């Protein structure tokens, strides 16, 4: 993050604009809207500045720039067509520790001004960090079309209710659930837009007096295979509404950065053969947090119902009467194969695909004879440590040694690495890779050279 987004309280505070043209006028409108006590300095002014001065809205200082104009200022803007003058204003402000914006010169400025969507008191600011103002403007226009004009009225009304809501609901969780109900209530929003006081009062009383469900809930969310762009929209909504997020090591930092900032985060870092927190304890964490009335998200890499032990966790919740739901995710097999240019099925090479755990525990022998058959694709999850055994067993049961194989490490991430070869090389290839990795075996791997789009980017 190159810039910290902040909202400045400028009401009745001295601000300076140097420049008297059209660009300076646009900046002046923003400062006047914010209630600043504005002084504008220039050699000449367009008529709008004169009109504002005549109305007593700002002060004009005609003539060359004088650094003393900054002495009482909180904030300054250099908006002339003279680069040297703009630089001088910026340096003078910097020496006084005053924030200064230099129009069209972000590197010379100590702050930049975003594109603004104004639904006062709700404000949305969009910035490209000064690199692409046109892109920021296009995004602002798109957001303008998505945010109803009456949104500001809803926000203002919520401010009026805050005291009563704080008295009515004892805990932060109860208040948040109330506000969520209020903000998605279409009838209230329409009544505010129409200024229908009777309907506003009726709807508000109904929402406040409606009993809240004090039970917590758990949502099992699949985070996908790594790339944050592959997180589903519903998954994103759930992690941004969560009070607690319980996650493991397969969830990327990019996805965790999307979690609501004030949510509690509980790391239970699981990987093959090692559990930072035992599965039974994870089950109890979910149960314990939900019993406190919290909204809990269990965030798992890939899909929670494919080798994620999601079913075991939900059984514990079900037995305790805790409400739960599941948001599927893109499983590693689908994501890793797509980002490696390997179609899992193909008319000529594979009519089926098998997803297999590589945890070859004692007493859990796989059906190697069927796995060695042609016209299918095998995908081994967590199979890196057992690659030599997988190679030996498949060859023993008749799979040709020249069968194409690939191992995908950190699939779909920018650090993705893929190596391929033949089945006779699988054990050796696995020694070159690190976890998390996925093993893909089948004729479809031979299409990788032609279809490998991701690494070519």
From Swiss-Prot:
Pathway, per record: Cofactor biosynthesis; adenosylcobalamin biosynthesis; precorrin-2 from uroporphyrinogen III: step 1/1; Cofactor biosynthesis; adenosylcobalamin biosynthesis; sirohydrochlorin from precorrin-2: step 1/1; Porphyrin-containing compound metabolism; siroheme biosynthesis; precorrin-2 from uroporphyrinogen III: step 1/1; Porphyrin-containing compound metabolism; siroheme biosynthesis; siroheme from sirohydrochlorin: step 1/1
Organism field: Escherichia coli O6:K15:H31 (strain 536 / UPEC)
EC annotation from Swiss-Prot or TrEMBL: 2.1.1.107, 1.3.1.76, 4.99.1.4
Keywords: Cobalamin biosynthesis, Lyase, Methyltransferase, Multifunctional enzyme, NAD, Oxidoreductase, Phosphoprotein, Porphyrin biosynthesis, S-adenosyl-L-methionine, Transferase
GO MF term list: NAD binding; precorrin-2 dehydrogenase activity; sirohydrochlorin ferrochelatase activity; uroporphyrin-III C-methyltransferase activity
UniProt protein name: Siroheme synthase
Pfam families for this protein: CysG_dimeriser, NAD_binding_7, Sirohm_synth_M, TP_methylase
UniProt key word Aminoacyl-tRNA synthetase: no
Ligand binding (NAD(+)): 22-23, 43-44
Active site, renumbered: 248 (proton acceptor), 270 (proton donor)
Family under the similarity heading: In the N-terminal section; belongs to the precorrin-2 dehydrogenase / sirohydrochlorin ferrochelatase family. In the C-terminal section; belongs to the precorrin methyltransferase family.
Domain of life: Bacteria
GO BP: any one term: siroheme biosynthetic process
């Amino acid at each position: 993050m190159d810039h910290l987004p902040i909202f400045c309280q400028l009401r009745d505070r001295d601000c300076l604009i140097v420049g008297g043209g059209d660009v300076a006028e646009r900046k002046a409108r923003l400062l006047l809207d914010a209630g600043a006590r504005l002084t504008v300095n220039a050699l000449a002014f367009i008529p709008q500045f004169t009109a504002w001065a005549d109305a007593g809205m700002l002060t004009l200082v005609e003539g060359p720039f004088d650094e003393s104009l900054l002495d009482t200022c909180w904030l300054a803007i250099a908006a002339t067509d003279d680069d040297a003058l703009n630089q001088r204003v910026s340096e003078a402000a910097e020496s006084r520790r005053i924030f200064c914006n230099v129009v069209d010169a972000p590197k010379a400025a100590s702050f930049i001004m975003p594109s603004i969507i104004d639904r006062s008191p709700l404000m949305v600011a969009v910035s490209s960090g000064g690199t692409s103002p046109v892109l920021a403007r296009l995004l602002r226009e798109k957001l303008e079309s998505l945010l109803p004009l009456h949104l500001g009225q809803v926000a203002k009304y919520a401010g009026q209710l805050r005291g009563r809501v704080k008295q009515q609901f004892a805990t932060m969780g109860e208040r948040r659930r109330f506000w969520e109900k209020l903000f998605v209530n279409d009838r209230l929003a329409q009544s505010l837009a129409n200024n229908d006081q009777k309907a506003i009062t009726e709807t508000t009383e109904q929402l406040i007096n409606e009993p809240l469900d004090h039970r917590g809930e758990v949502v099992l969310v699949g985070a996908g295979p790594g790339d944050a762009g592959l997180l589903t929209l519903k998954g994103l909504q759930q992690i941004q509404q969560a009070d607690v997020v319980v996650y493991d090591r397969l969830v990327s930092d990019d996805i965790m950065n999307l979690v609501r900032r004030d949510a509690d985060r509980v790391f239970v870092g699981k990987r093959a053969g090692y559990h930072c927190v035992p599965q039974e304890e994870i089950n109890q964490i979910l149960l314990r947090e939900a019993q406190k009335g919290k909204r809990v998200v269990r965030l798992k890499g890939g899909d929670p119902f494919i080798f994620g032990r999601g079913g075991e966790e939900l059984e514990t919740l079900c037995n305790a009467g805790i409400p739960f739901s599941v948001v599927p995710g893109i499983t590693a097999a689908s994501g890793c194969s797509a980002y490696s240019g390997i179609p899992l099925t193909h008319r000529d090479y594979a009519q089926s695909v098998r997803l297999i755990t590589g945890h070859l525990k004692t007493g859990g022998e796989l059906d190697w004879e069927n796995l060695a058959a042609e016209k299918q694709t095998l995908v081994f999850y967590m199979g890196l440590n057992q690659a030599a055994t997988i190679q030996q067993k498949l060859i023993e049961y008749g799979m040709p040694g020249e069968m194409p194989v690939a191992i995908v490490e950190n699939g779909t991430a920018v650090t993705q690495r893929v190596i391929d070869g033949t089945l006779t090389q699988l054990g050796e290839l696995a020694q070159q890779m690190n976890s998390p990795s996925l093993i893909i075996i089948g004729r479809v791997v031979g299409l990788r050279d032609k279809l490998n789009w991701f690494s070519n980017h």
